[in-house]
Amino acid sequence: DLRMSRGLGDVYKRQLIQEYTELLIYRISETSLVKDRDFKLVLIDDRSLNAFAAPGGIIGVNAGLFIHADNEGQFASVIAHELAHVSQRHFARGILRGQDTNLASALVLISSIALAIVSNNPTAFIAGPAALAQEQLRYSRVFEREADRFGFNNLINAGYDPKTSLLYTSPSPRDIRRSRM
C-alpha cells in the first residue's frame, strides 16, 4: 500500500516518499525509450490525482497519486505514461507544431474575418478559430494515446502486471489529469 503511516514525522515521510518515487522512476526508465535518465523529481502538495513531465527531466507528482493509487502498479502506470511523454518528445513536438500552426492560425483568422465581412454575418468569424481549437484538441489526444501505448508497453517490460495499472483500466481524463508535456 502506498499510503504512508500517520505516525511518521512529516520530514521523514517526505524523504521516504521522495526516495521511493525516485527509485520507481529510475526502475521504470531502465526499460523505457528515454535516453537521458537525469530526472528531477518534484513532489507537489496537491491532493488531485496528477503527474506531469517537463523538459529537463522534470517529473512532477502530486500527493494525490499516493492517496488514490491502490497499488504500486497503478502508481507505476502513471509514471510510465509520463516517461512516455519524455521519450516521445511531446513537449518539443508540441512547440514545433505550434510554430507551424502560428502562420496557419493567422491565415485562418484573416480568412474568418474576411468571410464574416463578405457574408455580412459576424458569426461566420467563429468557424475558423473553432476549427483550430478542435485540431489542437485532436493533436493533444494523439499525444495522450501515444503516451498510453508506450507507457503500457514499458510498464510490462518493467515487470508490472498490466491488469493492476491505471493504463489497463483506461481512466477518463476526469479521473487522471495528465500533462501535455
Annotate each PLM feature.
Residues 2-8, 12, 168-181:
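Single conserved hydrophobic/aromatic residue that forms the stacking wall/gate
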Residues 49-72, 89:
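Active-site scaffold of zinc-dependent metalloenzymes
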Residues 83-99:
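Catalytic Zn2+-binding segment of zinc metalloproteases
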